[in-house]
């Protein structure tokens, strides 16, 4: 791997491992340690690349598995909403599987920490016992409302809930989104001999697989194909987790009247005509029966022991990401 990338990784301080929520919660330091180890390996099956920087200068890192210029590409994102660590854990579990058996007929790109500043803020809150909801990046922008497709459309959710769904000053105004939109644009991938035909974003919670559009009530031109892929994933998740099949919904129809302009899901589809899925990881494992959990936002989104669920979700998602199902 490039010495410059290793030096850049070493230049960013890392917090100690997190044990506040669970002994198995790795926290930002654990996630970065996994990526740092990869940067030091001479592996033919994986390549680590810095795609950009966050508002506060943290590296935005992507990992490519499989052969470059193979013609087809999958993209996996997690951590856009930094409270949703089960999505991040699932992405790392998926990367473990891809690293063990890299695909031979496509590239798979994973960006596991798409909002590093937000993840570090959540971790700091947990360490200090602050029960706060964190959805945004360091500038208070919801990165999943900042992508450069349909960004300017009216949203009732944003009108009623204001800052919770803050979209930013302009489409792709945030450095994290801008880096993703530039690096994985149709033109940039075409120059590298690749076409993105599958995309996946990992969130929490709700036990739902969402398909485009989020910005419109109407269905996409490829609705039947999108829905079929989503049902296959939802059924495999049910089999692997033992929680039953997840629901499949068009994003804009999940909460009637609450559209979501500027989503990554719509950008995947509008930019690439790709199969585009958003998985709301976890469903029956929030353990909110205790009243004390009602006032801890982190527990709304994450199981106490995330790694077992993450491993099951990764098994279910691997065929989709590899283009095998």
Predicted ranges, named:
Residues 71-75, 84-220:
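Active-site/substrate-binding loop(s) of hydrolase catalytic cores
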Residues 58, 67-73:
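Proline/glycine-enriched tight loop/beta-turn segments at coil->beta junctions
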Residues 2-59:
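Short glycine- and acidic-rich boundary segments immediately preceding or forming the N-terminal edge
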Residues 1-25, 151, 157-325:
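C-terminal accessory segments enriched in acidic
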Residues 62-66, 278-280:
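Short, well-ordered beta-strand micro-motif
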């Amino acid at each position: 791997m490039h010495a410059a990338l290793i030096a850049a990784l070493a230049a960013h301080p890392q917090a100690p491992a997190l044990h506040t929520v669970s002994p198995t919660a790795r926290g930002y330091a654990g996630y970065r340690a996994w990526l740092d180890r990869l940067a030091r390996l001479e592996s033919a099956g994986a390549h680590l690349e810095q795609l950009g920087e966050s508002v506060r200068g943290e590296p935005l890192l992507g990992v490519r598995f499989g052969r470059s210029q193979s013609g087809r590409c999958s993209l996996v994102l997690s951590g856009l909403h930094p409270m949703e660590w089960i999505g991040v854990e699932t992405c790392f579990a998926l990367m473990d599987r891809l690293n063990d058996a890299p695909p031979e007929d496509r590239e798979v790109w994973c960006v596991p920490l798409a909002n590093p500043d937000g993840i570090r803020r959540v971790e700091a809150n947990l360490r200090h016992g602050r029960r706060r909801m964190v959805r945004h990046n360091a500038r208070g922008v919801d990165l999943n409302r900042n992508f450069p497709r349909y960004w300017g459309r009216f949203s009732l959710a944003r009108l009623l809930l204001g800052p919770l769904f803050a979209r930013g000053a302009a489409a792709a105004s945030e450095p994290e989104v801008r880096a993703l939109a530039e690096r994985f644009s149709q033109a940039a991938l075409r120059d590298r001999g690749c076409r993105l035909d599958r995309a996946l974003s990992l969130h929490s919670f709700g036990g739902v697989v969402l398909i485009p559009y989020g910005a419109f009530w109407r269905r996409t031109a490829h609705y039947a194909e999108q829905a079929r892929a989503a049902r296959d994933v939802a059924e495999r998740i049910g089999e692997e987790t033992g929680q039953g099949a997840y629901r499949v919904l068009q994003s804009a129809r999940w909460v009637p009247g609450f559209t979501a302009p500027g989503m990554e899901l719509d950008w995947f589809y509008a930019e690439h005509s790709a199969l585009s899925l958003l998985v709301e990881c976890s469903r029956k494992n929030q353990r909110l029966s205790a009243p004390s959990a009602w006032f801890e936002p982190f527990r709304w989104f994450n199981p106490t022991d995330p790694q077992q669920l993450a491993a099951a979700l990764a098994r279910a998602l691997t065929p989709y990401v590899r283009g095998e199902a």
